[in-house]
Structures are given as C-alpha cells and as structure tokens.
UniProtKB/Swiss-Prot annotation:
One of its GO terms (cellular component) is cytoplasm. ATP binds at G127, T128, N129, G130, K131, T132, T133. The keyword Cytoplasm applies. It comes from the Bacteria. One of its GO terms (biological process) is cell division. Belongs to the MurCDEF family. Its EC number is 6.3.2.9. Cell wall formation. Catalyzes the addition of glutamate to the nucleotide precursor UDP-N-acetylmuramoyl-L-alanine (UMA). It is found in: Cytoplasm. This is UDP-N-acetylmuramoylalanine--D-glutamate ligase. Keywords: ATP-binding, Cell cycle, Cell division, Cell shape, Cell wall biogenesis/degradation, Cytoplasm, Ligase, Nucleotide-binding, Peptidoglycan synthesis. Pathway: Cell wall biogenesis; peptidoglycan biosynthesis.
Length: 468
C-alpha cells in the first residue's frame, strides 16, 4: 500500500527508468535511505505485476507503459533530485540531454551504489572482449584467499543490492565489470585498480565513432589510481605513449616487448614479473592465447592487491569458467562441440577459432553490429571446413564470405533447430574435429541475450545427441 503523504511530498524525487534488476535494486536502496522514488517502465506486461506490488509496499510508485520523454518529466522537473537510467538508454538520448541542461543529475545504478561504496576498494574492468572472464577469474582468486570480493556490474549481482542489504560493510574488494554503456552513466566511479583488456571496433551503433568508444573506455582508466593494460592488443599498444601510466602485460616471446611490459610468460611456462619468475603455470583450464592475456591481467591485479605468487597459483587449480565462453558441451574421441555464444563480435570469434587445432565447422549468425569482417573471413578461410549461417545476418554474411574469396561450403538457415538437423546429417558423412558455435553477432534478432542463445543451442544439442 502506497503512503499518499509520501507521494504528496514530491520534492527530491529520484526517478528510476526501467524495471530491470539494476533499476529495481537502485530503487530499493534509494528508498531504504529515505529517498522518494518513482519508477517508470516502458513495457506493460504481466511479468511486472509482482515486482510492482512488492515495490509499492515499500512506498515506491511504479508506472508501467510510461515512456522516457521529457514532456512527461517537465511538469515536476523542479522536484527531481536525480534520474537513474538503464545502460540500454543511449547517453545522447534527447531526454537525457535536456535533463542535463536543466542541471539534473543523470546516473546509472553503479553510480548510485558508488555513493555508499566509495570507501570500499574497487577494481574496474573494461574492454571490448575478455572483461567478463577477467572479472570472474579475479573475483575467484581473491575469494579463494579469504577476501570478500564479489563480481558485479555488467555481470553478477547489482551493486545496489549489496548497498540495500548492508553487505557492503563486509566487502574487501568490489570487482566490477564495466561496459562502455555503464561507464558513460557512472561519472563519479573512480576505481583503485583499472584494467583494460582489449579494444576493437564494437558498439558503433551506439557510440557513432571509434574515437568516442575509445575515449569512454579510456576515461575509466584515467580515473583509476593504478592501471593495467594488454600490450598484445594492437589498438592499446598503439596508444602506449598517450595512455595514463600503468602496468602492461604480454604473451609474446618477442624480447623487445619486455622493455614496455611488466608481466609475461616465458618459453618454459613461468609467469614473469618485472624480469623475475613468479611461478610456473601448470593448472589453467581456459583455452587460447586470449585467455593467457586475461590471466596475466588478473595476476597483475592480484599482485597489486597483495597476494603472493603461490596463493595465486593455488587458486587457479579449481577455477571453473563461466558458461557460453568456449564451453565444451560434448566430447568423444571423434568430435568436440563447443558453445561460444559469448562471441558477439568478430574479434571474439577469431580468438575462439584460433584456440582450436584441427578441422572445424562453425555456426555463425545473429544481428550484425556493423563491424568490419575481412579479418574474420581470412581466419575462416584458413581454419574451417565449412560454415553454417543463421538468423538476421545470414544473407549479409554469406555475401561477405563470397566477396572475400571464401571457397568452401556455406549453408544458410533461418533458425538453429533446422540448421542443427542438417549439421548432424553432415557430420555422419564428414570427419570433423570440432563443431564450434561462434555467432560473431549479437543475439537480439531472436534471443533476449547471449545466455539465452547459448542455452537454446545447448538444449538443441542435448536433444540431438539423445536421438542420435
């Protein structure tokens, strides 16, 4: 039941846009510190009714089917203290621009949490690819060493949930994956340690230019007290002299790189820290050079936190990677089936393909992000036996493959189920070492997110294996 007196006192209103997880916990936290909170949700479905009731019992007014437009806010704009927006809303949205011109604070859920968590140690991880693995692995290593270091931000639990439950008082380190969308709406967040994993063309439908995208990522590192970069990434390496001073890692054995870098792996699998052996890498389950880069970034951060080489090494032996990232879902003597649904762009797909030896058939498709695909096609020409395409981008990708000189078989389908029926027929007549699900595109043409897409793929594979 909503307290009408609470709603009549409309001064210092905090308007939260969106009933997603982060919006809900931002609203709950703000209300718990006696802020007046209103939530607007643009959709109007049955799935929102239960949470609407729960929030209204906390004296949070929830309006469904309410568009985020300035004319709806203008009548009570003088009473607005802040507007908390979802990362999915572009920062150049017309309403956001007008609100900022009026001096209204426009932030995201992470910035809301920062206001109470800023006295806690923070590690902020960003990058086009690799940031989720780095976030999860670093959190694992710190937690294995009796530090409470939850992973949060773009993955895991919304930080406002910790603020709401008072659990933040026990946190030793916040390990936050921060997308470019989240960095834009978290201007006050200043991590103790900032990590930049990779930088390649992505999200240009949102950021318009590569320079804008780069500068958003860069801003997080500039605000960090201590910075860690990936020298193997050519775009970061090319900005070596212009980026804020920090620690660099490399997996290259080219000794000329060691002058610029602080961490690398030698030819005997020893982790090297500033020219000295830290420990020998013996138990690390993740495939590919890109995951060795991720590991070195994590080691550099863990060392800055204060962990010994032995403690880091011991923590690696029981690490289990997150699903949908080069996830082996079936393996026998003849065939391995890998789910890499997290490969939502061409660079991520290339990294996965290059980590596999032997004959590959690949499944790709989804919604294109406007990326350049020439390098991806060149890798396919060298590494795969044939390609199966599905979804919204299938026709565009087929033409791109043909135009780039891909001479092997291309099969095109609208949906995964039909595609996999043909794939299993193909496998009966062709010997292939690996079936790789590497969409190279976003999932939004047919799925809510890459997790749903990956789960759907795994379900279909499970059904096919039972039949076959």
């Amino acid at each position: 039941m909503i307290d009408n007196n609470h709603l009549r006192k409309r001064k210092n209103i905090n308007l939260v846009i969106g009933l997603g997880k982060s919006g809900v916990w931002a609203a709950k936290y703000l209300r718990s510190i006696d802020k007046r909170v209103i939530i607007w949700e643009s959709k109007d479905g049955k799935e929102f009714l239960e949470i609407k009731t729960e929030l209204e019992e906390l004296n949070i007014l929830v309006s469904l089917n309410k568009e985020f437009v300035f004319k709806e806010i203008h009548p009570f704009i003088k009473e607005i203290e802040s507007v908390v927006v979802s990362p999915s809303i572009p920062y150049d949205h017309e309403t956001i621009i007008k609100l900022k011109k009026k001096g209204i604070k426009v932030i995201g859920e992470i910035n809301v949490a920062w206001e109470i968590l800023k006295e806690t140690n923070w590690i902020g991880i960003t990058g086009t690819n690799g940031k989720t693995t780095v976030t999860h692995l670093l959190s694992h290593i710190l937690c294995e060493n009796k530090l409470y270091a939850p992973f949060a931000g773009n993955i895991g639990t919304p930080l406002c949930k910790y603020a709401y439950s008072k659990k933040y008082e026990k946190i030793d380190w916040v390990v936050a994956e921060l997308s470019s969308y989240q960095i834009e709406i978290s201007p006050e967040v200043k991590p103790n340690i900032g990590i930049w994993t990779t930088f390649t063309e992505d999200h240009l439908e949102r950021h318009k230019t590569l320079e804008n995208y780069f500068n958003i990522k860069k801003s997080l590192l500039e605000k960090s007290d201590f910075r860690i970069y990936n020298y193997d990434d050519k775009n970061l390496r090319n900005h070596y002299s212009s980026l804020s001073k920090g620690v660099w890692i490399t997996t290259s054995l080219d000794k000329s790189n060691f002058i610029q870098c602080d961490y690398w792996i030698d030819d005997q699998a020893f982790i090297i820290e500033r020219g000295k052996r830290l420990f020998k890498l013996e138990h690390f389950s993740l495939k590919g050079i890109h995951n060795l880069q991720n590991l070195l970034l994590v080691i550099a951060a863990a060392r800055k936190v204060g962990l010994s080489g032995k403690k880091i090494k011991d923590s690696l032996s029981n690490y289990k990677q997150l699903p949908h990232r080069m996830e082996t879902i079936y393996k026998n003597n003849d065939l391995e089936i890998i789910n890499d649904s997290k490969a939502t762009n061409f660079d991520s797909s290339i990294a996965g393909i290059n980590s596999i030896e032997g004959q590959i058939i690949i499944i790709s498709g989804g919604r294109l992000k406007g990326n350049k695909y020439s390098e991806w096609v060149q890798v396919l020409k060298q590494k795969v036996k044939c390609i199966f395409l599905f979804g919204e981008s299938s026709k565009v990708l087929k033409m791109a493959l043909i135009n780039e000189g891909f001479k092997k078989d291309i099969f095109e389908f609208s949906e995964l189920k039909e595609l996999l029926n043909f794939v299993f027929h193909y496998l009966q007549n062709n010997k292939v070492g690996t079936l790789l699900f590497s969409p190279s595109c976003s999932s939004f043409d047919q799925f809510k997110n890459y997790e749903e897409r990956g789960d759907h793929f795994k379900k279909l594979i499970s059904e096919k294996l039972k039949v076959n």
